UniProtKB/Swiss-Prot annotation:
Highest taxon in the source lineage: Bacteria
Protein family per UniProt: Belongs to the CinA family.
Pfam families: CinA (PF02464), CinA_KH (PF18146), MoCF_biosynth (PF00994)
Stated name of the protein: Putative competence-damage inducible protein
InterPro entries recorded: CinA, CinA-like_C, CinA_C, CinA_KH, Competence-induced_CinA, MoaB/Mog-like_dom_sf, MoaB/Mog_dom
Lineage: Bacteria, Bacillati, Bacillota, Bacilli, Lactobacillales
Length: 423
């Protein structure tokens, strides 16, 4: 199965927006075992769009068009594809009802004839409902080639793909079963080196490493008859991979933290906090609230997080956390002393079970003779106060702050796992 992605919109060609849909769709197609061989961007022009559709139809079995489903005259995708397929546009009853419901709450003058275009589908296609917008998508197969039309805004496209298109394609084509392993504390190059024999000799299942900011994932994939067989094959391979050791002799299982494309260290940590009914607080310097903001993004965060501190300057660390100013000056803000003091004081002041702190040099300049990327992370519980030093070198200021936050979540996660092992 060969797929082609066509992004429709002059704003993509002029650089006004970034085509993030292409990456998302490519990942989804890979999960289904569908190869994406071509990606094309075309402006809001019928003649050029017809040309692109014609070319795609000659070299691909699945053509996915994104964008151009709106109410304006330059939204031409459905109209142009219908013209190419020599089919009419018809109204989808469910989409029409959604339009009625939407405009019933607004002034009558706000509904114009152009709005009706959003409820149209190509005759003979399967409508793809839009749960977060008004423009209905569609799926149609003509002469052995399948065509998909999707809205352009990612907030509309992603739910439509996840909830409508993926289940539909899973029924149409053989499914590729996948499992994503997530690692933190090892780089992609070392992980690939450690697993080089598996990767070089792979057949089925396949192994695909992906480097992300601060972490690495491995996608294990297999084509089998059902989920049970896939789970068995992927589980056996996973056990073999995690039994390997890093170049420093550390078990690879120690830097593995979870499963899933949409998982994260923050989510794993949050779920452990909920599981063990523990509360957490933070005092942040260089990350300026990023740890707390990330934690608060999860529904139900109030179960584990009541509040914390952002103490960017030395004076605020003394004033808000009650740390002795002279001691801070003596040790410096980029120090184990300061990190541990911040974590412990934050815990005591809020009554949380766990206190976390982040202090360091985001860059690009040095601070207190410490190079950019030097970070101290403190962690305090009722029984222990500790800190770690990490060096995040060669990274942008934004990346230093983000990766430091990952280290903080990982430190909390490991602490909670130790608690789990004691139960």
């Amino acid at each position: 199965m060969k797929a082609e992605l066509i992004a429709v919109g002059t704003e993509i060609l002029t650089g006004q927006i970034v085509n993030t849909n292409a990456q998302f769709l490519s990942e989804k197609m890979a999960e289904l075992g569908i190869d994406v061989y071509f990606q094309t961007a075309v402006g809001d022009n019928e003649e050029r769009l017809l040309s692109v559709i014609t070319t795609a139809s000659q070299r691909s079995n699945l053509v996915i068009l994104c964008g151009g489903l709106g109410p304006t005259k330059d939204d031409l995708t459905k109209q142009t594809l219908a013209k190419y397929l020599r089919k009419d546009l018809v109204y989808d009853e469910q989409a029409c009802q959604k339009l009625d419901d939407f405009f019933a709450k607004r002034k009558p003058s706000s509904r114009t004839p152009n709005n009706e275009r959003q409820a149209q589908v190509i005759e003979g296609s399967i409508p793809l409902p839009n749960k977060t917008g008004l423009a209905v998508g569609g799926f149609i197969t003509v002469d052995g080639i399948s065509y998909v039309v999707l809205p352009g805004p990612p907030s509309e496209l992603k739910p439509m793909v996840n909830e409508e298109l993926v289940p539909l394609l899973s029924k149409q084509y053989s499914t590729l079963y996948s499992k994503v392993l997530r690692f933190f504390g090892i780089g992609e190059s070392q992980l690939v080196t450690v697993l080089s024999d598996f990767i070089e000799n792979q057949t089925d299942p396949t192994i695909a490493p992906y480097a992300k900011t601060g972490e690495v994932t491995l996608r294990l994939s297999t084509k089998t008859e059902n989920q049970a067989l896939a789970d068995k094959k992927l589980g056996q391979l996973e056990a073999q991979l995690l039994s390997r050791k890093t170049l420093e002799g550390q078990p690879l299982a120690d830097v593995f933290y979870g499963y899933g494309e949409d998982n994260s260290l923050a989510r794993e940590t949050f779920e452990l906090l909920v599981k063990y009914d523990k509360t957490i607080t933070a005092a942040e310097s260089l990350t300026a609230g990023l740890f707390q903001s990330t934690l608060a993004s999860f529904p139900g965060a109030s179960q584990v997080f009541n509040g914390g501190f952002v103490t960017y300057s030395m004076e605020e660390k003394a004033k808000m956390l009650g740390l002795p100013l002279e001691e801070l000056k003596s040790h410096g803000v980029v120090s184990a002393y300061t990190a541990e003091g911040m974590a412990e004081q934050a815990r005591l002041l809020t009554g949380a079970d766990i206190g976390v702190s982040l202090t360091g040099v985001a860059g690009p300049d040095m601070l207190e003779e410490q190079p950019a990327g030097t970070v101290f992370i403190g962690l305090a519980t009722q029984n222990k106060v500790e800190s770690i030093k990490v060096l995040i070198s060669g990274r942008s200021r934004l990346d230093v702050r983000y990766i430091a936050t990952l280290h903080a979540f990982n430190m909390v996660r490991k602490t909670l796992l130790k608690l789990e092992n004691l139960l």
